Amino acid sequence: MKKLCAFGELLIDVTPYGVSDKGYPLSEFNPGGAPANVAVALVNLGVEASFIGQVGDDHWGHFLKNVLDDKRVDTQGLLFNKKYLTTLAMVNLAENGERSFSFYRQNGADVMIEMNDLFKLKIDESDI
């Protein structure tokens, strides 16, 4: 069986979720990031997948690791960064249902990642 190694962003999608009784917008916090989503989808199809990336050593970073672990994605290549926060993506929904994103990621942990030997090993172990 082929092994996939996904590299890139793992973040929180802050998605609109209605309006409160006081008329304020409500939001739902969902795991996101295209590479991580691909890894989860392939595991669901029976493919062995690992994820390489970096999140903040914060509430959201640990939440995201737990999600990937629960979905059976190998997270040995996921780093926690004490200096930079986990990236947030604000999801904007148009009336026609199209999504657009505003990223809160200046110096976000996912874009401050540097290649290391562990990443190289995980990539070498993978077929894709």
What does each of the following model-derived ranges do?
Residues 52-128:
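Conserved N-terminal subdomain of the carbohydrate kinase-like
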Residues 1-73, 113-115:
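Glycine-rich phosphate/adenosyl-contacting loop at the front of the ribokinase-like
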